[in-house]
From Swiss-Prot:
Membrane topology: Single-pass type II membrane protein
GO BP field: carbohydrate metabolic process; fucosylation; lipid metabolic process; olfactory bulb development; positive regulation of cell-matrix adhesion; positive regulation of endothelial cell migration; positive regulation of endothelial cell-matrix adhesion via fibronectin; positive regulation of sprouting angiogenesis
Glycosylation sites (chain numbering): 66, 302, 328
Main location as per UniProt: Golgi
Native organism taxonomy: Eukaryota, Metazoa, Chordata, Craniata, Vertebrata
Keyword RNA-binding assigned: no
Stated name of the protein: Galactoside alpha-(1,2)-fucosyltransferase 1
Top enzyme category: transferase
Species whose genome carries this gene: Sapajus apella (Brown-capped capuchin)
Name of the gene encoding the protein in the UniProt record: FUT1
Record-annotated membrane-spanning stretches: 9-25
Keywords: Glycoprotein, Glycosyltransferase, Golgi apparatus, Lipid metabolism, Membrane, Signal-anchor, Transferase, Transmembrane, Transmembrane helix
Cystine bridges: none
Length: 366
């Protein structure tokens, strides 16, 4: 029989070993939960059901701070998987992205974008939402919801854990409470911002040759809207009288502004915008295949004149400053007003100038 002191030493040693093993197991368990691993990692014979979400991001999605994961880490309180159909052009997809982000946060869900939206927005902005793998998208039991273009009470209490949104939402009523986060998501990549600022630095006032202090971005939407607005929506696009009045509004309030004009109809702009004061610069390239060049230029201006469309909305929203927009651009009985609410489309502090609807009256005459 061992002396009593030896027995105590052995018991103490065994107790330390047991406590160390328990502590090690608890540490591994807690660390695995913190990093998103479940009991299936510790016990391979257990097959737990996990949400069908992507585990990778496409190249170009920035990494979150203080993490080695290529995808941003979602807060542990979020669950489920939400995404949105990428539809339409550049401005449409910006609206879809911002609305998805805002509604997912409001409902405590994780937001993912589809590869097509990533391909449109990631080359321009430092977006952070992860990308849903196509194979995961195809096997997820989605519920689908088409959104109208303004925030509604029912959108704050959507119970579906796997929801695919659709539509063309671009209303500030969805996301304005997250304005700084939205502006951060739509931060330009450095080379695009620097290129746009380089263009602005080279501009000079025509009469004096001085460097302007105030830049007003002007976006003139034309293209397919020339047919779509009058023929489908009983509406008009901006004419030269609107642009002249909008520019005069800024001239009356800002010292020596310069107007930086971009459009998908630059030829019309050069022929119809009054340049006699020497403060109008035609800087846009009008290339619809590469809209980010004009967009970057507009966002680096101090203020905005927009006409109609989501491209102009987002340029104004990100630029900040004063915004003048084309108001009342459809007839009162237009079907467009069933899907578009002006009070939900334009921020309350923005200034509207009424459109000239007389061309529509001419069309209506027998």
């Amino acid at each position: 029989m061992w002396p009593l002191s030896h027995r105590h030493l052995c018991l103490a040693f065994l107790l330390v070993c047991v406590l160390s093993a328990i502590s090690f197991f608890l540490h591994i368990h807690q660390d695995s939960i913190r990093h998103g691993l479940g009991l299936s990692v510790l016990c391979p014979d257990r097959h737990l059901v996990t949400p069908p979400v992507a585990i990778f991001c496409l190249p170009g999605t920035p990494m979150s701070p203080n993490t080695s994961s290529p995808c941003p880490q979602h807060p542990a309180s979020l669950s489920g998987t939400w995404t949105i159909y990428p539809d339409g052009r550049f401005g449409n997809q910006m609206g879809q992205y911002a609305t998805l982000l805002a509604l997912a946060q409001l409902n405590g869900r994780r937001a993912f974008i589809l590869p097509a939206m990533h391909a449109t927005l990631a080359p321009v902005f430092r977006i952070t939402l992860p990308v849903l793998a196509p194979e995961v998208d195809s096997r997820t039991p989605w519920q689908e919801l088409r959104l109208h273009d303004w925030m509604s009470e029912e959108y704050a209490d959507l119970g579906d854990p796997f929801l695919k949104l659709s539509g063309f939402p671009c209303s500030w009523t969805f996301f304005h409470h997250l304005r700084e986060q939205i502006r951060s998501e739509f931060t330009l990549h450095d080379h695009l911002r620097e290129e746009a600022q380089s263009v602005l630095r080279r501009l000079r006032l025509g009469r004096s040759g001085d460097r302007p202090r105030t830049f007003v971005g002007v976006h003139v939407r034309r293209g397919d809207y020339l047919q779509v607005m009058p023929q489908r929506w009983k509406g008009v696009v901006a004419n030269s009288a609107y642009l002249r009045e909008a520019m005069d509004w800024f001239r009356a309030r800002h010292e020596a502004p310069v107007f930086v004009v971009t459009s998908n109809g630059m030829e019309w702009c050069r022929e119809n915008i009054d340049t006699s004061k020497g403060d109008v610069m035609f800087a846009g390239d009008g290339q619809e295949a590469s809209p980010w060049k004009d967009f970057a230029l507009l966002t680096q201006c101090n203020h905005t004149i927009m006409t109609i469309g989501t491209f102009g909305f987002w340029a104004a929203y990100l630029a900040g400053g004063d915004t003048v927009y084309l108001a009342n651009f459809t007839l009162p009985d237009s079907e467009f007003l069933k899907i578009f609410k002006p009070e939900a489309a334009f921020l309350p502090e923005w200034v509207g100038i009424n459109a000239d609807l007389s061309p529509l009256w001419t069309l209506a005459e027998p």
